[in-house]
Amino acid sequence: MLSDTIYALSSGAPPSGVSIVRISGPLTRNILIRLAGSVPADRSASYRTIRTRNNEPIDNGLVLFFPGPHSFTGEDVAELQIHGSKAVLAALFFELGDIPGVRMANEGEFSRRAFENGKLDLVEVEGLADLISAETEMQRRLAVEQSAGGVSAIYDSWAKRLIRARALIEAELDFPDEDDVPGSVSDMVWTDMKRLRDDIGLHLKSASAGEIIRDGFKVVIAGAPNAGKSSLLNALARRDVAIVTDIAGTTRDVLQVDLDIDGYLVKLYDTAGLRQADDRVEMEGVRRARVALRDADLALLLVDMSNPMIPGDLDQTLPHVTVGTKKDLVETGSGRYDLQISTLTGDGLSELRQLIGRIVAERFTGLSLAIPSRQRHKDSLTKCLAALDAAISEIDADLELRTEQLRLAAEYLGRITGRVDVEQLLDVIFSEFCIGK
């Protein structure tokens, strides 16, 4: 409930050098008076002693106050920066929890209040969640673009064009003889709507790039048994992930590790050797390997140069790099390989990482980071584009029906940013946050 005042640990779990406790809601000023003696100057750090109701000191620290609506949540907000021990936090939380109308925040409740009070839209909220969980440089940059409102500004500008088009058409329908209504607005409106359709279509094509940055570029290691697949996974991961033996068919399941290559999240998969298997367990492993290949962004086709075998039924249309392995066992490799490596000596591994990085980066050539990054963005944009296309192409339909399609297109755009009813999405989105955000 927005009438409650909420509090939570906003920094990392204790013990730590400093912990930040965030408070938001109508009782924030009263809490500061009770705990710190008075309300400090707006947006200024004040060194205070935090005390219990019995005037016993809990800790010394910095107190900051941000009056609403000029705060993160749009409400009165306070931050207490204190020592990050479990005992200090327990004592502080005991005092806060004992105040009527004050309670511990739920997951993402601070951000949800920011959304409810118009401080953030849904895309910005999702960008904030992604920024908190970002592990690579490109994830950070994409999250900053979204949390700063760059993507939302694009969607808002498109929504305004749709609203203007509807207004002009409806004005022409309702007031055909008025001098204030431009005559024959149809040509102007539908020309702009065609441009908008092209803009949205181009934007939608970049959705896969956003998904790759956020969810990872899938690289599958494939090849015949004993081609060195598990050894390569371990070498690139720089740790023992997969069991390596000379026995063919050791790998039965798909193993996966995350790599940071040139700022991109790369999901690397080790798979069972591709061959006709008799063992039921190995057969299932081969099946899973083929499923992984089908979903891959890139396949590393490994060939043992000391005993070259390439699975004959491998889909050659799949984006792939042919890698000759066990370079240390042959004098000169064939020119049939894009790259030759030895996991024993490390020869060629750096070049392979660089090659993967270049291939990933090529997917983003010429793209800005103002791109959709989630499946729900993609779904709403697809529906928006379909409604807009229907409005443009159904030239023989009643003008009011075409205008209704424009309204639907604007509604689908609004669902992305939360400008229209998206109540069913909110619990899912805000549950991704930690308690103190």
Swiss-Prot record:
It comes from the Bacteria. It comes from Rhizobium etli (strain ATCC 51251 / DSM 11541 / JCM 21823 / NBRC 15573 / CFN 42). This is tRNA modification GTPase MnmE. Residues 216-361 form the TrmE-type G domain. Its cofactor is K(+). Keywords: Cytoplasm, GTP-binding, Hydrolase, Magnesium, Metal-binding, Nucleotide-binding, Potassium, tRNA processing. The keyword Magnesium applies. PROSITE patterns: G_TRME. One of its GO terms (molecular function) is GTP binding. Pfam families: MMR_HSR1, MnmE_helical, TrmE_N. One of its GO terms (biological process) is tRNA wobble uridine modification. Binds 1 potassium ion per subunit. It is an enzyme of class 3 (hydrolase). Homodimer. Heterotetramer of two MnmE and two MnmG subunits. (6S)-5-formyl-5,6,7,8-tetrahydrofolate binds at R22, E79, K119, K437.
